[in-house]
Design a protein with these regions (language model features):
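Long, intrinsically disordered, low-complexity segments
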Residues: 25-29, 52, 94-97, 162-164, ...
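Polar, glycine-rich mid-to-C-terminal structural blocks
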Residues: 226, 269-298
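Sec-dependent bacterial lipoprotein signal peptides
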Residues: 2-24, 214
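Acidic, glycine-rich segments characteristic of secretory precursors and extracytoplasmic regions
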Residues: 2, 26-65, 81, 88, ...
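Conserved, well-structured interaction surfaces
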Residues: 70-142, 166-206, 315-328, 333, ...
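C-terminal substrate/ligand-recognition segments
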Residues: 296-358
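Short coil/turn linking the two alpha-helices of tandem helical-hairpin repeats
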Residues: 139-141, 146, 198, 224-233, ...
């Protein structure tokens, strides 16, 4: 049966979350330790310094056990126990970041009288984009996860769901497909409010979330939509939805047309399937000037010291830059071209041009853009990224990967496609339910 999925704006997501309890303290995290709203009562740049800049500092953390790089490695599958400390550290890291984003949104609302309407919209869009990226990572790792929102957002969705705040203020999980809808919708909504410049172009937006970063995430989500839209992964993926049957509402004109004074007729939308949606956002990145010569699109390890008047100036020499060695997020145009080639092949198209652009840039001869060849080159050319596990799952090779030790491979089942919910999180929040297949390990 054709599955029609229209992902366009926030109210679509409300309908799918009618039974979800959304509250703001699921994990007993304390984002106030990293964000102090007491000083954010000055200029717009000072509000930025206290609400947005700390999110990037936290995102670029390199402390062992902090972040998601380590557990994405295939050798980390030696331990899939809910008691694994690394699993809990990654869960804690992601939800602390989400909690910080929610607090930032609340702080921006409180300081809105000191911001123009455009500044407020842009600030909140940037925070929501960071939060969506963190939710994307959490969904990819753990499957069914809780959704936590800011205070203002919770007031909107709580009446719609008919839920009431419990004494514990804990949130239940949502299905992975619902999380996917939410993330995709959030990114589509914030896109027009973000700067169009490259995240790695020196200036006030250096190292920050910009439109190319969000377009990359939307392309990646669409490419993996077959996986994320299927909730019964414990039974394998034979019955997963087909990319041609998953439909997305995509803005085909300038999404910022109404914001920048354009005509309503310029703000058009079109229904595309999952593969066409991936191709669409990959093309957006090409239109934005991304290229193999300047391969990086985003690197969360970038550090900058923002000048006091950063919102008013773009001079490169006014910002100090540095970069630790271990980025948690790194997006490259090589990945974009390989994603587009794969999506074209899966949509009965021809991905040779994009595929062989990547090979030529690496000094390799042209060859057929078969799915097997694309996966092989992704494993080599994107070895430093955190997408190898994700790629193997999408290609149906994860449980048979030659990169896994034989002892590990024999122990894996379809349940292993997602990680278990950490036992410490389950103990704290009685509304969380362990992922299928891991119950006996508790």
């Amino acid at each position: 049966m054709v599955m029609r999925r229209y992902i366009s704006h926030l109210f679509t997501w409300v309908i799918s979350f009618l039974t979800l309890l959304v509250f703001s303290s699921c994990l007993n995290e304390h984002p106030k330790d990293q964000l102090d709203g007491g000083g954010s009562n000055g200029s717009a740049s000072e509000i930025f310094d206290t609400t947005i800049a700390p999110l990037y500092d936290f995102m670029g953390g390199t402390i062992d056990g902090e972040g998601i790089r380590d557990i994405q490695r295939l050798d980390s599958l030696l331990s899939l126990s809910p008691d694994d400390e690394q699993l809990y550290s990654s869960w804690q890291y992601l939800y602390r970041a989400i909690g910080m984003c929610n607090k930032s949104l609340d702080m921006i609302d409180l300081q809105s009288v000191r911001l123009t309407d455009n500044q407020k919209a842009q600030f909140k869009a940037e925070v929501r984009a960071i939060r969506a990226m963190m939710y994307y990572e959490a969904m990819d790792l753990y499957g069914r996860i809780p959704v936590l929102l800011s205070s203002a957002e919770s007031l909107i969705y709580e009446p719609a769901s008919g839920s009431s705040v419990t004494d514990e203020k804990l949130s239940a999980q949502s299905e992975r497909s619902e999380i996917f809808h939410f993330i995709f919708s959030e990114l589509q909504q914030v896109l027009p409010y973000l700067p169009q410049t490259s995240s790695l172009e020196e200036g006030s937006h250096y190292g920050r979330i910009t439109q190319p970063v969000v377009n990359f995430l939307l392309a990646k989500l669409a490419l993996n939509a077959e996986i994320y839209m299927y909730n019964d992964w414990a039974q394998g993926y034979r019955k997963r939805p087909k990319g041609r049957d998953l439909e997305f509402m995509v803005r085909t004109a300038d999404g910022a047309s109404l914001i920048t004074g354009g005509k309503a007729s310029e703000n058009r939308s079109k229904i595309l399937n999952a593969w066409e949606t991936c191709i669409f956002y990959c093309n957006r990145l090409a239109d934005e000037g991304c290229s193999l010569e300047e391969d990086e699109i985003f690197n969360s390890s970038v550090r900058y010291q923002m000048p006091k008047d950063a919102l008013l100036m773009d001079e490169a020499d006014s910002v100090q830059y540095s970069r630790p060695a271990k980025p948690l997020f790194r997006f490259r145009y090589t990945d974009v071209l390989l994603m587009k080639a794969e999506a074209m092949e899966r949509n009965d198209g021809d991905g040779r041009a994009e595929y062989n652009m990547v090979r030529a840039h690496a000094g390799l001869p042209a060859r057929k853009s078969s799915l097997a060849n694309i996966l092989e080159d992704r494993q080599v050319m994107l070895a430093g990224e955190t997408c190898h596990r994700q790629d193997l799952i999408r290609f149906g090779k994860f449980l048979k990967s030659s990169h896994l030790r034989r002892s590990v491979q024999s122990a894996l089942t379809s349940c292993s496609i997602v990680f278990p919910i950490p036992q410490r999180s389950l103990a704290f929040n009685g509304k969380l339910v362990q992922n299928k297949g891991y119950e006996a390990m508790e």
